[in-house]
Design a protein with these regions (language model features):
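Structural/interface elements that position substrates and couple domains in central-metabolism enzymes
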Residues: 1-261
Length: 261
């Protein structure tokens, strides 16, 4: 209750740390998340160490430099629940380490499980769509992050491919993706994974809404926030990116569900 919260806040007020007032279930889960993450960090460092030793690399030097990066490596970055990772770097480099470790007979169970965990997250998104029982699915955001046209190993492309394979009618809009402009490996990837993508693309959010019943938001492109104002009654919105966190959006008027919230 509010009175107890004030008493506890006063007791801890001298400590150089913020005080959060939460429900007991979130407070308890934070402890589990803390300790699970610490265990993951220990296991990660040890797996890097085993791999480094097998390749004649000094893991102490590697990790001493690794921890200097407080923008990405040791930071809040990548630590918010959302959709699966993708792009031209993370999947490729993780597979490279895993492949080389197998050649050297070095066991890296945690890193080997990361790709499968990522695929499971894509399957989870597919199951969320399936549970609505609608066949006309719109996808906002084809690339793995906002403000890029890089489609290589985008988890959204994988999700779309699986939806099409299961007979869903898919429409796509991405403000950054113009098919005639795609080049090289990027163009080859999307044409291989979704051969008829040109027929699926819409020219605007409005057009996509007119042709679909369920909308999946794949990245946090600013333009996609308009779905919370322009949606038709009955639209379901599945948020994979956290775009619904924007302060000026009214989620009370839409049928909205986040992938992890």
């Amino acid at each position: 209750d509010e009175c107890s919260a004030k008493v506890l806040a006063h007791l801890y007020s001298e400590l150089p740390a913020p005080v959060f007032q939460l429900r007991p279930r979130e407070a308890a889960m934070i402890k589990y998340a803390d300790n699970a993450f610490h265990a993951v960090k220990v296991s990660f460092a040890n797996e890097i160490g085993r791999f480094c030793k097998a390749t004649n690399v000094d893991s102490r030097i590697v990790m001493d430099v690794f921890i200097q990066d407080t923008k990405l490596n040791l930071s809040p970055y990548y630590l918010k629940p959302g959709f699966a990772f993708g792009g031209s770097c993370l999947p490729k480099d993780l597979r490279a380490v895993s492949h080389r470790a197998k050649q050297l007979d070095v066991s890296l169970p945690m890193m080997n499980a990361v790709i499968e965990s990522n695929q499971e997250h894509i399957r989870h998104a597919l199951e969320m769509v399936r549970e609505y029982g609608r066949k006309r699915i719109g996808v906002l955001g084809l690339s793995f992050k906002a403000d890029t046209d890089d489609l290589r190993e985008s988890p959204m492309v994988s999700l779309i491919e699986q939806l099409i394979g299961k007979g869903y009618e898919v429409k796509i809009y991405d403000t950054n993706v113009t098919l005639p402009r795609l080049m090289g490996a990027n163009k080859e990837f999307i044409e291989r994974e979704v051969p008829h993508i040109a027929k699926l693309m819409c020219l605007s959010v409005k057009e996509l809404l007119e042709k679909t019943d369920v909308v999946v938001v794949g990245n946090r492109g600013k333009e996609y926030e308009s779905i919370f104002r322009e949606h038709r009654n009955g639209h379901r919105i599945i948020d994979l990116s956290g775009i619904g966190e924007a302060k000026d959006l009214n989620l009370d008027e839409v049928k909205y569900e986040g992938i992890c919230w």
